[in-house]
């Protein structure tokens, strides 16, 4: 359900700056590869995956759909994914996949959760 919050260019830029202020020391500008499994029409994916990593000169690997979760295996197999953002459902599904849990991607530096507290 939409919360009716007005998004302005200034709001978006402030959000990008907030994200960078928290993670700047962990982002290797121009070298990161972020997996975008959430749709960009959600503000979290739009600001974090697209705007933040675009600003950092990084690559976005777009997953057309994370369902079934095996769709993401190809992205992890073919790209050196360094960051992934998601929601509880996505992370729970990944951790229940044998290919992910048995051999986690060596290049993955960080996972960031949005939408609710990570469980």
Please place each PLM-identified region on the residue numbering.
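Conserved S/T- and glycine-rich ATP-binding loop of Class I adenylate-forming
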Residues: 1, 12, 34, 40, ...
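Conserved AMP-binding A3 loop
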Residues: 1-17
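Short, flexible micro-motifs
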Residues: 7, 48, 60, 116-118
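Conserved AMP-binding/adenylation subdomain of ANL enzymes
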Residues: 13-33, 43-82, 93, 97
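Short acidic-hydrophobic sequence patches enriched in Asp/Glu that either
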Residues: 7-11, 68, 86
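Adenylate-forming
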Residues: 38, 65, 81-119
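Short acidic capping loops at alpha-helix termini that bridge into adjacent secondary structure
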Residues: 3, 29-33, 106-108
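Conserved G/P- and acidic residue-centered "switch" motifs that form tight phosphate/ATP-binding loops
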Residues: 1, 57, 115
């Amino acid at each position: 359900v939409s919360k009716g919050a007005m998004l302005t260019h200034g709001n978006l830029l402030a959000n990008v700056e907030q994200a960078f202020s928290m993670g700047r020391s962990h982002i290797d500008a121009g070298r990161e590869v972020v997996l975008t499994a959430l749709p960009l029409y959600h503000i979290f994916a739009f600001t974090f995956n697209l705007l933040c990593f675009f600003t950092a000169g990084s690559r976005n690997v777009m997953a057309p759909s994370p369902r079934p979760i095996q769709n993401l295996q190809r992205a992890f197999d073919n790209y050196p994914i360094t960051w992934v953002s998601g929601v509880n459902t996505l992370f729970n599904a990944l951790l229940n996949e044998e290919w992910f849990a048995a051999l986690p991607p060596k290049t993955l530096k960080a996972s960031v959760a949005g939408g609710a507290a990570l469980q």
